[in-house]
């Protein structure tokens, strides 16, 4: 039987650290795609997504496992915080370009 995300976290918290790889396998693409919506450079997005997984593993013992808690939602929140940090490091000029550029809609510069 397949373990739930919550059960994997419980077992990782009890010392079965190798099971964290199962979460990574299940949800890596989802986390990467989430990051790619904000950071268009694939290599940078992969770095940010990878850092989210590293931080999740480092903080896993503090994650409160409940049946109504989304493990992947927690990892996406970590990724969102890292995206914010990345954008802050870029500075306001680069950030405003990324925020305002939408290739699906016309842009008007006044």
What is the predicted role of each segment?
Residues 47-54, 69-81:
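Structural recognition of an alpha-helix C-terminal capping motif at a helix-to-coil junction
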Residues 1-2, 93-110:
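Internal acidic/polar
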Residues 6-9, 17-21, 42, 68-76:
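Short, structured helix-loop boundary elements
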Residues 58-66, 76-98:
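Arg/Lys-rich amphipathic alpha helix in sigma70-family domain 2
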Residues 5-6, 24, 28, 53, ...:
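Hydrophobic alpha-helical core bundles mediating ligand binding, dimerization, or RNAP-core interactions
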